[in-house]
């Protein structure tokens, strides 16, 4: 019987072990999509407890705790202590067997704090106290944790109206790890939301544009896009339910925009026409700036209205959707390609039934301008686990070029999520090692090592043009 989470965790063959320990493990981390709070990096935030670091804002854990029968006050409440929240999480952990949370929890304890005991009610107090004691040390600050995991670059997720002051502060402080903003204009796209007009007014104010028409909005966005570029931004991200290809005219979009600004109800068709027009304009800006564009699609968000009204978005009430969007995706990418305005693109699906859809879509629009111009993003959100990442890499392997994959990202708000890169790299090495063991791949150590190092780091470094 193997030991739990020993040095060869997930590595089932000698080839896998060699690839990980001698190649993957030594590569720095480029975390090109995350949700870190820039202020915490800029001010080198010191965490008052493991509860703040681990449970503050982590909807993955909240979701598991609720499922385990834990009252909401121990997840998001303000009338419970840090210890009480941690204790409830420790009570939940033994029930997360076979959930990625169990692996993540113990990888984080091991790599950050050197703790190899399993978290449970029996060990909760001891682990809580040891973590909190270490969090008082300088090397456990926000920046210290990034250094610990050999992070080289992170890309935060930022709204067009953000002033990026904390990115500038971090840059000017001489911090050796790059923190780059990423453009996420969802609030300008979501015309059906009740606060759309209010947001447009804020956008106009920040951009210095009197915003009354769609053209005004595009002008305002372009100014903010330029501002982001001046501050080092190299990529955009769009959270969409599906792709849109409904035909529209400029006059139709102006009419739709005017209705929304007056607070009038829009039809489903009008909403889709606007989103198509918006994403088209956004893609044109990205192409002109030589950015990479990312599309995360397929989530049904904020399913629980009662809890949304209490807690807001991103609190653990989202799920996988069923959207038939392959044709619209193809039409949208083709439209950009026909006009010579299709920039480097990463496609992420939340529903794994679309893995092969995306993996085959990539080849339609590769043009030889760079390796893997159109990418299949790593297993996202609910797929960020062994089975989901395996399925994503298998689909990419058989229908594209796994060797040109830009690899892993945390997509996380936590400074303790970097072991997910290790988790991914171990899995990658194991997939290749097993293929060698079965005679499906040659035991070409040089080629295998290069492939692992490229997917772990080199491909992302070359693809995003951060340097």
Task: Describe the role of every protein-language-model region.
Residues 293-295:
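C-terminal amphipathic alpha-helical interaction region
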Residues 267-268, 317-323:
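A short acidic, glycine-rich active-site loop
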Residues 308-316:
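Short glycine/proline- and charge-enriched loop/turn segments
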Residues 304:
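Hard-cation-handling environments
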Residues 323-329:
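Divalent-cation-assisted or electrostatically stabilized phosphate/pyrophosphate-binding catalytic cores
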Residues 332-338:
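Short, basic/hydrophobic alpha-helical segments
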Residues 2-289, 341-343, 347-352, 356-359, ...:
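Metal-cofactor-binding active-site regions of metalloenzymes
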């Amino acid at each position: 019987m193997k030991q739990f989470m020993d040095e060869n965790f997930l590595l089932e063959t000698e080839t896998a072990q060699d690839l990980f320990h001698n190649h993957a493990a030594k590569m720095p981390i480029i975390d090109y999509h995350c949700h870190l709070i820039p202020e915490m990096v800029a001010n080198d935030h010191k965490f008052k407890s493991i509860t703040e670091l681990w449970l503050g804002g982590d909807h993955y854990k909240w979701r598991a705790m609720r499922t385990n029968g834990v009252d909401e006050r121990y997840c998001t409440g303000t009338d419970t202590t840090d210890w009480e929240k941690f204790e409830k999480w420790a009570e939940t952990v033994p029930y997360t067997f076979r959930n990625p949370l169990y692996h993540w929890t113990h990888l984080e304890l091991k790599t950050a704090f050197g703790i190899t005991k399993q978290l449970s009610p029996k060990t909760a107090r001891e682990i809580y106290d040891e973590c909190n004691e270490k969090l008082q040390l300088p090397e456990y600050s926000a920046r210290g944790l990034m250094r610990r995991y050999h992070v080289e670059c992170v890309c935060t997720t930022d709204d067009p109206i953000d002033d990026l002051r904390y990115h500038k502060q971090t840059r000017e402080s001489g911090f050796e790890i790059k923190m780059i903003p990423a453009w996420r204009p969802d609030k300008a796209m979501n015309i059906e939301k009740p606060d759309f007009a209010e947001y447009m007014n804020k956008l106009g104010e920040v951009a210095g544009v009197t915003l009354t028409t769609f053209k005004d909005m595009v002008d305002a966005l372009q100014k903010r896009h330029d501002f982001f570029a001046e501050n080092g931004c190299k990529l955009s991200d769009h959270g969409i339910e599906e792709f849109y290809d409904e035909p529209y005219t400029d006059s139709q979009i102006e009419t739709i925009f005017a209705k929304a600004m007056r607070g009038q109800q829009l039809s489903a068709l009008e909403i889709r026409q606007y989103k198509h027009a918006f994403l088209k304009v956004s893609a044109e800006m990205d192409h002109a700036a030589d950015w990479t564009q990312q599309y995360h699609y397929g989530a049904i968000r904020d399913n629980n209205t009662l809890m949304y009204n209490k807690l807001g978005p991103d609190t653990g009430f989202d799920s996988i959707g069923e959207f038939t969007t392959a044709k619209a995706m193809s039409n949208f990418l083709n439209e950009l390609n026909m006009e010579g305005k299709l920039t480097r693109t990463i496609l992420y699906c939340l529903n794994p039934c679309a893995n092969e859809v995306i993996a085959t879509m990539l080849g339609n629009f590769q043009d030889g301008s760079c390796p893997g111009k159109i990418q299949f993003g790593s297993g996202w959100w609910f797929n960020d686990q062994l089975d989901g990442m395996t399925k994503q890499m298998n689909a990419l392997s058989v229908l594209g070029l796994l060797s040109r994959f830009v690899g892993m990202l945390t997509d996380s708000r936590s400074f303790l999520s970097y072991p997910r890169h290790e988790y991914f790299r171990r899995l990658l090495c194991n997939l290749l090692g097993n293929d060698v063991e079965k005679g499906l791949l040659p035991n070409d150590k040089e080629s295998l090592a290069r492939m692992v190092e490229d997917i772990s780091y080199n491909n992302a470094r070359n693809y995003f043009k951060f340097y």
